[in-house]
Amino acid sequence: MIYKAKLIDQTNKKIAIVASKFNDLIVKQLISGAQESLEMHGIDESNIDIIWVPGALEIPMVAKRIAQVQKYDGIVTLGAVIKGDTDHYDLVINGVANGISQISLSTDVPIVFGVLTTDTLEQAQQRSGAKSGNKGAEVALSLLELINIFEQIKSI
């Protein structure tokens, strides 16, 4: 048997978007892209909840709690970490990426990583809706595919 992700029958899905308030001008664009993508694939606006957290490092903690509640079919994580002149950038991106990875492996709720990690503000702007598309929209589609795969493999 071959199992392949499909973007079908998503109408009754409940989605959480966990978003960092830091660099909110970029993150708001990512959220818009994610919302539009989810709605284009049948998710009603009333089934999309946005949970704002102070910064990117708080995303994994809140995503874990949301997954534990088991109210949502999937979780999108969004943020923008832009490199500065200190090593803090590396600490933040490693903490966020590792945290989300651990949570996604330890829960039964699909979670996708949509935290931009860029060297410049311009790169973040390009990836949040300018030249390079909108990564929020892309990860939202990935989430819908994961939800579908999870549903298919329940019967294995």
Curated annotation (Swiss-Prot):
GO MF term list: 6,7-dimethyl-8-ribityllumazine synthase activity
Keywords: Riboflavin biosynthesis, Transferase
Enzyme Commission designation: 2.5.1.78
Residues reported in the UniProt entry to bind 5-amino-6-(D-ribitylamino)uracil: F22, A56, L57, E58, A80, V81, I82, F113
InterPro entries for this protein: LS, LS/RS, LS/RS_sf
Catalytic activity, as annotated: (2S)-2-hydroxy-3-oxobutyl phosphate + 5-amino-6-(D-ribitylamino)uracil = 6,7-dimethyl-8-(1-D-ribityl)lumazine + phosphate + 2 H2O + H(+)
The keyword Ribonucleoprotein belongs to this UniProt entry's keyword annotation: no
Catalytic machinery residues: H88
Transferase among keywords: yes
Pathway: Cofactor biosynthesis; riboflavin biosynthesis; riboflavin from 2-hydroxy-3-oxobutyl phosphate and 5-amino-6-(D-ribitylamino)uracil: step 1/2
A Gene Ontology BP annotation from the UniProt entry: riboflavin biosynthetic process
Domain of life: Bacteria
Binding site for (2S)-2-hydroxy-3-oxobutyl phosphate: D85, T86, R127
GO cellular component, one term: cytosol
CDD domains: Lumazine_synthase-I (cd09209)
Pfam entry (one): DMRL_synthase
HAMAP family the UniProt entry points to: Lumazine_synth
Family: Belongs to the DMRL synthase family.
Function: Catalyzes the formation of 6,7-dimethyl-8-ribityllumazine by condensation of 5-amino-6-(D-ribitylamino)uracil with 3,4-dihydroxy-2-butanone 4-phosphate. This is the penultimate step in the biosynthesis of riboflavin.
Annotated protein name in UniProt: 6,7-dimethyl-8-ribityllumazine synthase
Organism: Leuconostoc mesenteroides subsp. mesenteroides (strain ATCC 8293 / DSM 20343 / BCRC 11652 / CCM 1803 / JCM 6124 / NCDO 523 / NBRC 100496 / NCIMB 8023 / NCTC 12954 / NRRL B-1118 / 37Y)
